[in-house]
From Swiss-Prot:
Signal peptide: none annotated. This is Mitochondrial coenzyme A transporter SLC25A42. The chain crosses the membrane at residues 36-56, 92-112, 138-158, 189-209, 233-253, 296-316. The keyword Manganese does not apply. GO terms for molecular function: ADP phosphatase activity; ADP transmembrane transporter activity; AMP transmembrane transporter activity; ATP transmembrane transporter activity; coenzyme A transmembrane transporter activity. It comes from the Eukaryota. Belongs to the mitochondrial carrier (TC 2.A.29) family. GO terms for cellular component: mitochondrial inner membrane; mitochondrion. Solcar repeats lie at residues 34-120, 132-217, 227-315. The gene is slc25a42. Its main location: mitochondrion. GO terms for biological process: ADP transport; AMP transport; ATP transport; coenzyme A transmembrane transport. It is a multi-pass membrane protein.
Length: 327
C-alpha cells in the first residue's frame, strides 16, 4: 500500500472456493509520479536525438549569426566543407557535448513542464480530460519553454561560446565556465538572457500550439487517435517552421550578446544590439541572417523531437501497463 499500488489478493468465498480479489489499482499520486518520470525520460531522449541530427547545421548557423559576413547557402556549404578539410569530420559536431549537457535537461524539463502545465490549465479552465482551447494551449507551450530556459540558460551560453571559438581557446565545458567567470564575471553567464526568454515565449508557445493543434485536427478528420510516425514528423516540422520564423530576430540578438566577449563587440542591450546589427548589416541580412538554414534545420529538429517524445511516451506507458499487470 505504501508504494501506491494495491496488490491482487486471493480470498475464500462462502462455499470455500478460492476467489481473486480486484486487480492492482494504482493510486493517483503514484500515476502522476510515473507520468512525470516518463515525460522527463522521453523529453531527454527527444532533445538528444534531434540536436545531434542537426548539430553541423546548428554550428554553422551560429558562426554566421555572430559575424558580419553575409549568409548564403553557398557560403554555408563552403564553411562546412572547409571545417571538414581543416579540422576533420567530427569537428562538425564541435560543441555538441556542451549542447547535450544543455539540451538533455532543457528538453526533459520543457516536455515535462508542458505536460504538467496542460493538466494545470486544463483543471483551471475546466478542460480536464479533453483538449485545451487555443489560448491555454499556446500558454502551456510558452510557460514550458520559459521554465526550461530559466533553469538551463548558462549551458546554452557555454554551447554558443564553444561553437564559435577554436578548440585551443576552451578545452571543455568546465573550462568555459571557469574562464568566463574569472575574466568576465559571474554576470556574464546570463548575458543575453532577456532576449532569449523573449524569443522562447513565442517560439515554444507557437511550436507546441501548432503541433497540438495539428494532432487535434488530424484526430477529428481521420478518426484515428494516434497519428502515424511520418505524420508526427510532418506536424513537428510545421511547428518548428512557424515557431522559429516568429522568434528568429531575437535568436540572432541573443547569440551576438552571448559571444560578445570573443567577437570584440560590446553588445549591452537588446535594443542597442538590434540597432547596431541593422546599421551595419540591414534588417533582412542582419536580423534574419541564417533563417533559410533554419528553415531546413529547424523543422527537421523539431519534427524529430516531437516524434521521438511521443513514441517514447507511448512505449514507456505500454511497458508500465505490462509491469502493473505482471504484479
Amino acid at each position: 500500500m505504501e508504494n501506491g499500488i494495491k496488490e491482487s489478493q486471493v480470498g475464500l468465498n462462502k462455499n470455500g472456493t478460492h476467489a481473486i480479489l480486484p486487480s492492482p489499482v494504482v493510486s493517483e499520486g503514484h500515476k502522476n509520479h510515473k507520468s512525470i518520470l516518463n515525460s522527463l525520460m522521453s523529453g531527454a531522449l527527444a532533445g538528444a536525438v534531434a540536436k545531434t541530427a542537426v548539430a553541423p547545421l546548428d554550428r554553422t548557423k551560429i558562426i554566421f549569426q555572430v559575424s558580419s559576413n553575409r549568409f548564403s547557402a553557398k557560403e554555408a556549404y563552403r564553411l562546412i566543407y572547409r571545417t571538414y578539410l581543416n579540422e576533420g569530420f567530427l569537428s562538425l559536431w564541435r560543441g555538441n557535448s556542451a549542447t547535450m549537457v544543455r539540451v538533455i535537461p532543457y528538453a526533459a524539463i520543457q516536455f515535462c513542464a508542458h505536460e504538467q502545465y496542460k493538466k494545470l490549465l486544463g483543471s483551471y479552465y475546466g478542460f480536464q480530460g479533453s483538449a485545451l482551447t487555443p489560448i491555454p494551449r499556446l500558454l502551456a507551450g510558452a510557460l514550458a519553454g520559459t521554465t526550461a530556459t530559466i533553469i538551463t540558460y548558462p549551458l546554452d551560453l557555454v554551447r554558443a561560446r564553444m561553437a564559435v571559438t577554436p578548440k585551443e581557446m576552451y578545452s571543455n565545458i568546465i573550462h568555459v565556465f571557469m574562464r568566463m567567470s574569472r575574466e568576465e564575471g559571474l554576470k556574464s553567464l546570463y548575458r543575453g538572457f532577456t532576449p532569449t526568454v523573449l524569443g522562447v515565449i513565442p517560439y515554444a508557445g507557437i511550436s507546441f500550439f501548432t503541433y497540438e493543434t495539428l494532432k487535434k485536427l488530424h484526430a477529428e478528420h481521420s478518426g484515428r487517435t494516434q497519428p502515424y510516425p511520418f505524420e508526427r514528423l510532418l506536424f513537428g516540422a510545421c511547428a518548428g517552421l512557424f515557431g522559429q520564423s516568429a522568434s528568429y530576430p531575437l535568436d540572432v540578438v541573443r547569440r551576438r550578446m552571448q559571444t560578445a566577449g570573443v567577437t570584440g563587440h560590446a553588445y549591452g542591450s537588446i535594443i542597442g544590439t538590434m540597432q547596431e546589427i541593422v546599421a551595419e548589416e540591414g534588417v533582412i541580412r542582419g536580423l534574419y541572417k541564417g533563417l533559410s538554414m533554419n528553415w531546413v534545420k529547424g523543422p527537421v529538429a523539431v519534427g524529430i523531437s516531437f516524434t521521438t517524445f511521443d513514441l517514447t511516451q507511448i512505449l514507456l506507458k505500454k511497458l508500465q501497463r505490462l509491469s502493473d499487470i505482471q504484479r
